[in-house]
Amino acid sequence: MQLLLLFLLLVGPYVILTGLSRWTGFKTAAMIRARIGISLFFAFTALGHFIRAEEMSAMLPPAVPYRLQIVFVTGILELLGASALWVPDLMRPTGTCLILMLVWFLPANIYSAIYRIDFGGHGAGPAYLLVRIPFQLFLMWWIYWATEQNWLEKKASGM
């Protein structure tokens, strides 16, 4: 259920603003509509890092030191990312950093699903990963597109 809410936060503004632009004639660039959703997504998920920090820290293996501090720092990074998307000179590097952060978070999501940590759907066990991993890949692609990344194209054309 939480992933559905996150998906709606992510793509809802794009869909709503696209509909409004067709109805009212008010035009907004597609990538701006997408970045609104990305900002809402990361602002919302950052709140969890502060409101439910103890529960979120359980998503990290016990051997990881400073788990609670890591949760707070990553929450701050998510808020900074949500904001920095709107600074023109920072948009692309912020997009890259958000994608890398999502790659960095994936092992915690896998760990918490395997050990059924009861936070954000992970209590469902490994089956949750059948939904979570494709969602995370979609999220990374959405950020890549909305922040006008081109490093995949550069790599492909250099081959």
Predicted regions and their residues:
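Membrane-interface extramembranous regions
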Residues: 1-159
